[in-house]
Amino acid sequence: LFFTMANIALPGTSSFVGEFLILAGSFQSNTTVCFLAATGMVLGGCYSLWLFNRAAYGNIKVQYIHKFGDINRREFATFLPLVILTLVMGIYPEIWLDPMHVSVQNLLCQIQL
């Protein structure tokens, strides 16, 4: 559920920062495109929640429920760094944005924006 919520750009996750920057930049140049992009993001979020609901609570037969268990230590050790990285990128995105600043400025100068 955490990664589904991160996928739909829950504030505090890495996807929120990316989608916010995209919408802020597109709003300055073309409001119509920004509105269409925001609509697509909302529809994508609805689809992600629908997909999670189907995958997690969908068509499970009672005889197979005993085969599903909770997350084990190995799976937890796999997910924990991903969860931490997703939260760090969402809470403090400057770690990744600051090194890209010079390259983005050079690109903008080349296309004269």
Predicted segments with their positions:
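Functional transmembrane alpha-helices
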Residues: 1-69
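Cytoplasmic/organellar membrane-interface segments at the starts of transmembrane helices
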Residues: 49-113
